């Protein structure tokens, strides 16, 4: 199994949009300044869900993986807990709990899509507050925040989102300049015309659908392509909507509710 031990990207969960968290986070950073500590403050608070070693032509697979994790985890909810400020190497970080299942699932989906994800060393979820030139004593600092976490889109807006970020990317207004981002609150929510994909499609349609899409969108093997499209169609996931938006033939068959071959 390949690991991203020399990563060039990471899956990012940005935090700057959570006002309750940010109020406490900025207060902690101001304490460092008041103490006269020479440090570099983190300008884009986030949690790195996993690291990747990928090429630009794999971005689409990463986007599909992120959409799949959001779609499949329709009931994914709980709390994200930030606490225990401490030094991790030369960085002051917060412990983070609540992303464990998300981490495991996104790594599994990315690997299934041919992406090198996660490292051979144990993943330690954390949120960086500041970086020092050398290790510092930080005893006495306190921090605690619990943020409700919802990764579901049932017509409700949510602040949750995932991004693909290239390591070393610049930061603007509290966010990384990402290669792509998927925000739950911006998702399309229309449903397939029937729960039975096979009722209106035949295997012979796959080539016509594939011809409307970009190379690599659908597997070249017809059975694999059929299985993938059927899976996402019946679950109203992002990939169904991607094909619906980009394939004239697919939209026609959906509208006619009958095979046009």
Curated annotation (Swiss-Prot):
InterPro entries: Coronavirus_NS2A (IPR007878), NS2A-like (IPR039573). Its main location: host cell. It comes from the Viruses. GO terms for cellular component: host cell cytoplasm. Keywords: Host cytoplasm. The keyword Glycoprotein does not apply. Pfam families: Corona_NS2A. It is found in: Host cytoplasm. Gene3D superfamilies: Cyclic phosphodiesterase (3.90.1140.10). Belongs to the coronaviruses ns2a protein family. Not essential for virus replication in transformed murine cells. This is Non-structural protein 2a. It comes from Murine coronavirus (strain A59).
